[in-house]
Amino acid sequence: MNLEILLYENRKAKLLNILKIGINPFKKFVSTGEIEEELGLVQSREDLLNIIMNTFDKDENIILPIIGGVGTGKTHLYWSLKKRLHFYNTFYISLENVYRKFYYNMYSEYIEEMGGGEVLRSITNKLCAEWGATERKFGFFHIADIDKVRNSAFEKLKSNFDNKIALNDVINAITSHQLDPYKRVEAERWLLGELMDIRDLSHLNILYDLKRKSYAYTMLKIIIENSELRSVIFIDDFEKIVSLMKGDKKSEEIFDPSWLYGEEHIQSPETRSAQKALDKILDLQKIKGLRIIITLKSIDALEEIKSIIREKNNQLLATMKEPIILSNFLENDIFQFYKENMKAFLKNNNYLEFFEEFPDSYFPLNEKILKYIHTCSQGNPREIIKFFIKIFNEIIFSNNNFDNILAYYENQC
């Protein structure tokens, strides 16, 4: 046995010892919008990412559908996109969990994503300056004329908002935040989306907190349109809207209550909430510079959404781009995916020299097993990772001989 082979065998033995500690390189296999995904992109996903970014560079107010079945990596794509869009506020909402209090939840996610109070203070300072806060009243302290600033803001913004009461209260909160030292703390709490009691609201001379949909929408529009960064909202599980609007399919009855009361009066609360949520999402198109990504599991679901939008406002369909199809992994993708994640695993365990010395090795698996996994999983990323977890768990925890484990999976091919 020559020296190179001996070195390789020693390196393999050390890698197996690291695995035997009980660490599975693929232990996490379901990506969520709340937990950051660290896995890299394979080449076919890189190409899709470039298409999305080019689309964002060309257009501002768009709806971009992404179609992908269960386990194809839609949420993983969100994390990869978020890392690439350095000059965007990119935030995630799942309609599986959030379709009630939509604007409030969206605003909360947006504020958290952009960094909270510090960035918010920068935006409110910029707004007050544009509204005339730099012009000072005469007097010992040369303070700004708050009423004049508020009137100026209202005149500049009123044509862009239907709810003038909400607009007036939002302006009060922003100007109090910057120009009134006695109300600054409460105003910042209000702007950050905290729920407030009547006493605090009265102190600010404001009727409602941001749980009120018109208030949350007004704040969203003002903050997004005046942020230094462009904005992307990634709305996952969009077909939830379709399923809720359909409601439960019932068998045909001799008497249908809708004949007497009308369809709108027999809808379930969930159906009405879904319709309202869709209306709110469509209203987001009025926010200048907001790019919207929606994910669905099928083209059929997208066509149903288009049909609903067509009935509500046919012009909005012009803002909807052709869908991007998130297909399963190609065979080359699984090799790249496996190598990249094994490399990350070795780096985290201070054993990157294995990868550096043997860059073409797929140890502890091999090409034959990787091809078997791709075939059995039909290229579905989630199913691929489940296979990896299963095989690595056997390597780590099973009493079976390592060579016998590999031989078993090789014989499945």
Locations of regions flagged by a protein language model:
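The catalytic "switch" region of P-loop NTPases
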Residues: M1-I18, V185-L365
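A short, basic N-terminal segment
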Residues: M1-L64, K126, E130, F138-I146, ...
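AAA+ P-loop NTPase catalytic core and its hallmark functional loops
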Residues: S31-E38, N54, N61-P65, T72, ...
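Phosphate/oxyanion-binding active-site loops and adjacent basic polyanion-contact surfaces
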Residues: E37-L48, G73-K74, V98-M106, Y208-A216, ...
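Charge-rich, solvent-exposed alpha-helical interaction surfaces
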Residues: I51, K126, V149-K156, D169-A173, ...
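Short, surface-exposed basic-aromatic patches at helix termini and helix-loop junctions that form
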Residues: N54-D57, S80-Y88, D283-K286, R310-L316
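P-loop NTPase nucleotide-binding core
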Residues: N61-S227
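C-terminal alpha-helical "lid" subdomain
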Residues: S327-C413
